Amino acid sequence: MQQWSLLVVSFLLSPVPVSAIKELPKAKKYEVVYPIRLHPLRKRETQEPEPKETFETELRYKMTVNGKVAVLYLKKNNKLLAPDYSETYYNSSGNKVTTSPQIMDSCYYQGHIVNEKVSAASISTCQGLRGYISQGDEKYFIEPLSSENLDEQAHALFKDDSNEDQEKSNCGVDDALWLQGLHQDVALPATRLIKLNDGMVQEPKKYIEYYVVLDNGEFKKYNKNLAEIRKIVLEMANYINMLYNKLDAHVALVGVEIWTDGDKIKITPDANTTLENFSKWRGNDLLKRKHHDIAQLISSTDFSGSTVGLAFMSSMCSPYHSVGIVQDHSNYHLRVAGTMAHEMGHNLGMIHDYLSCKCPSEVCVMEQSLRFHMPTDFSSCSRVNYKQFLEEKLSHCLFNSPLPSDIISTPVCGNQLLEMNEDCDCGTPKECTNKCCDARTCKIKAGFQCALGECCEKCQLKKPGVVCRAAKDECDLPEVCDGKSSHCPGDRFRVNGSPCQNGHGYCLKGKCPTLQQQCMDMWGPGTKVANTSCYKQNEGGTKYGYCHVENGTHMPCKAKDAMCGKLFCEGGSGDLPWKGLTISFLTCKLFDPEDTSQGVDMVANGTKCGTNKVCINAECVDMEKTYKSANCSSKCKGHAVCDHELQCQCKEGWAPPDCENSATVFHFSIVVGVLFPLAVIFVVVAIVIQRQSARRKQRRVQRLPSTKDAKLHNQKCRPQKVKDVQPQEMSQMKKLHVSDLPSEEPEPPPDVLITKPNFPPPPIPVSLTGRAKVPFVKTPHPFSQQIGRVYLK
């Protein structure tokens, strides 16, 4: 047997007992390998050690892949199972038995090969290493060769054989019905692509709540071993989750059901019949007892032809058609998981890949031939299809992550799912990046108000009235924060009956159904509504014109209801995404589908059929009487309007609950309330500082005359030339004695400027007894050295 060298560790290689080697189906070539677990080097712990987990958050294994030593990096998938995960089987009496296993720790991992640009891994470590590894274009399966619960034991690593059962490898969805039909805009115009991308940026992460059913043949195939079946289903779900993570969608397994006592529906080789039967069972039975978004049936039945899977297109979130069926067509269950992911893609609006689609890897999920290789990514076409599906509001169930009150399992802090008694859950302390959440306790940190949600910003609640979800279109309403919760309220719509599309329609549950839009959805761009004469055919009561079907008979429409029966259009494409016949006569064009349960060929409820009249169940009825929405908004207090459930909703910018306080005014009042006292304090402080400054300046002016002022004084007060004083005149002047000086310093007259000396002067007398004016004498005064200059008045 030719072997590939996948792990060269000579001292670990040893003969494996034949009794310990499991029989690997059709695996004629495999290499016995011993994965080596690499333990990370850790710094000395400075904090309280974390609780030890049975399965670590991150793992690394060393092995040689494709002749080169490689390190496999794995990260635990903590959210593989939904919090309300349950398992259902039937006892010998046919009674349903449902359990909620407390699976406290996960042994399912996803990852890649370190330093490889294109690689992926989906691995279970529950009992050794079991799963799938890809490296470039090479794909491998790995399985333990013994039942020992060891990872460093003998494993078989074998290549994905693309030649296995190639003759039976196709999906049953017919592409010919889709390439030019509703989804003909796979190659969308640039403007449309920009719109889709812009819309996706704002969308939250998608949650696909997944339910798997196995028929009685599968139960027998796995020797009626429920534990083994659970292990296989969880490995498949882990692989599917790995694929859809690339679309920012999380696939959470909410339940597994095994028909242990017999099949609950008729399963035949006709895949279409089996799909219809499973669809009805799901809507009438399963959905009433278990909440989920999509259900798939895995069957051991060999479907006719090359079909191994079938699903309804663009039906995710539909109560009856969000289903798919998959044949257990391979000995390797992960190949079956690839088909399960493929059929789920159809439910999400994806068509098969064709030549012009760009695939990041060798094979993508939506390739029509499902057996050639294991898919590892989605093509460019699939991504555009998926974005379009989300844009068309067909995916409402994907945006509702499980509510804590809906969770019945034991809460586990660190699984990144918000459960009862948890404020937040950001993963383990190593994984957590939320600064508001304490990862050890799943509680909000002290001093903070919130940790997540549209109404939480920087760990604080946003103010009431702040818009947390803008209106998407004219039939939508904006949602505002209430100031109490960190989460945005549920999506609300304008009251049913509000005019839309420039008066061509009326809103109904957030949509604006019009004949024009339905014709374009059916036949594509360039389609328009047929003449009213075509709609008169609905009064005939034939297969090509009717309002109801009763006991197989096509019932005619009344004249007033003719616009509410069969849909008639003109122009557009000749191909449709549904099986059936296209019938044209004159300018009238209609569609006769094989499956009438979807009602795509009939005028939709809520379509305008006259002034204040809408179609409801193929009858043209009075809108206000039907919707009961007349004057609803007048009953709302404050700045509120009525929504589609006749409840009062605050207008944009107005704070709940009374809608009387504007968010803008509220914010302004807060700003004013804070800034006004600060402004008053600032003004008071400024006045005090100014007065103190003025006083200090006045003192300096009084005590320290400036040189500039002295110069001005010398210029103004320079005496005129007078004749010299004669000695006899001097003798007549009154003698000046020190005792004659005044005891107090009077204020200088305002017209007298003071000269600043070079040294601190003593008190300067400015006036003497007597009123006779004495001219300034240049001759030094006897006291001039003591008192400086003397100014006489």
UniProtKB/Swiss-Prot annotation:
Zn(2+) binds at C171, H342, H346, H352. Pro-domain removal and maturation may be, at least in part, autocatalytic. Its EC number is 3.4.24.-. Residues 196-668 are extracellular. Residues 1-20 form the signal peptide. Disulfide bonds join C317-C397, C357-C381, C359-C364, C468-C488, C632-C642, C636-C648, C650-C659. GO terms for molecular function: immunoglobulin receptor binding; metal ion binding; metalloendopeptidase activity. It is found in: Membrane. A motif (Cysteine switch) lies at residues 169-176. The conserved cysteine present in the cysteine-switch motif binds the catalytic zinc ion, thus inhibiting the enzyme. The dissociation of the cysteine from the zinc ion upon the activation-peptide release activates the enzyme. This is Disintegrin and metalloproteinase domain-containing protein 28. It comes from Mus musculus (Mouse). The lineage of its organism: Eukaryota, Metazoa, Chordata, Craniata, Vertebrata. The gene is Adam28.
